[in-house]
Amino acid sequence: MSEFLPFSRPAMGSEELAAVEEVLRSGWITTGPKNQQLEQAFCRLTGNRHAIAVCSATAGMHVALMALGIGPGDEVITPSLTWVSTLNMIALLGATPVMIDVDRDTLMVTPELIEAAITERTRAIVPVHYAGAPADIDAVHALGKRHGIAVIDDAAHAAGTYYRGRHVGESGTAIFSFHAIKNMSCAEGGMIVTDDDALADRMRSLKFHGLGVDAFDRQTHGRAPQAEVLTPGYKYNLADINAAIALVQLDKLAAHNARREQIAQRYLSELADTPFLPLARPAWPHQHAWHLFILRVDRESCGLSRDELMQQLKEQGIGTGLHFRAAHTQKYYRDRFPQLSLPETEWNSERICSIPLFPGMSDGDCDRVIAALRTLAER
């Protein structure tokens, strides 16, 4: 059998190794100059005034919600078809996650579905820019503004995603992920961007013990050695080892996303006559980052279930992923929201499958995936 082909693999090279070595030799391996450089570079990418590096996008979501004052009695609207970390952060703050349905074909939240879920207790909306494509940012943000509700864009899949010529995040506050499978990675990490000065100050403090400054800030700006706690906070800072990797990855992002686009276009072209159903592209002008390539596998039209297809591909040495099982079907949320019915989410959650897509894939790897899927489609 051929070597196992995972559905994703980090695209790391000699430049990342050299960047890590530089940090290790510098003597400053935790939050320091590389974080500062990364934040500045990310602001240039998205066009925001502030970028705040954190140890994960989950940490970023936590401090963003905290900085907005989200707590008991509040409601936060977000899709169920997302990674559970967003729901978990809402729940851990004592607030109520209001899970809504998505468009059946794009898997995006819509302004209509969001507005139908708004109540007098709604404090925030968290739209998900899914698989590398953007939700309808202008419409969602206009809705939030009209109702006086904060919007936090879940841009974990959206490094290099553009909406109407603007990078996702430019319009407000957004959270990106640098997890191992993301378009740019530093193993674990994330970035919050915002143009809200006061919100940025609160998030910076909350991510580092609730202090007004961190150790590097004190050293470089000559501030008092005894930093003051402004509010109880967390230790969500990013180490410079990770930031150095992320800086290199950011430089490679455009090239990596271009390769992802090439692979995705091959899949779209060469699987078009199979019963496996890809996601529809959003109607608004955008540049897709192709974080994931999703197929929907319906037993009635495909002759096998999603789980059976994933097993068949695994037996042929091809990895797949599931992004995501609907959050409201997970035990914790199922027990708390037993009557919740989201038909489009549930239909997709039972059928979605992520097939291999990463910049290090060769043309031969693509051939192998396409051939395996075509064979399964013909059975």
From Swiss-Prot:
Enzyme Commission no: 2.6.1.87
Protein role: Catalyzes the conversion of UDP-4-keto-arabinose (UDP-Ara4O) to UDP-4-amino-4-deoxy-L-arabinose (UDP-L-Ara4N). The modified arabinose is attached to lipid A and is required for resistance to polymyxin and cationic antimicrobial peptides.
Pfam family, one: DegT_DnrJ_EryC1
Cofactor(s) annotated in UniProt: pyridoxal 5'-phosphate
Protein name as it appears in the record: UDP-4-amino-4-deoxy-L-arabinose--oxoglutarate aminotransferase
InterPro entries, per the entry: ArnB_NH2Trfase, DegT/StrS_aminotransferase, PyrdxlP-dep_Trfase, PyrdxlP-dep_Trfase_major, PyrdxlP-dep_Trfase_small
MF annotations from Gene Ontology: pyridoxal phosphate binding; UDP-4-amino-4-deoxy-L-arabinose aminotransferase
Family to which this protein belongs: Belongs to the DegT/DnrJ/EryC1 family. ArnB subfamily.
GO cellular component terms, semicolon-separated: membrane
Classification lineage: Bacteria, Pseudomonadati, Pseudomonadota, Gammaproteobacteria, Enterobacterales
One of the GO biological process terms: response to antibiotic
SUPFAM superfamilies: PLP-dependent transferases
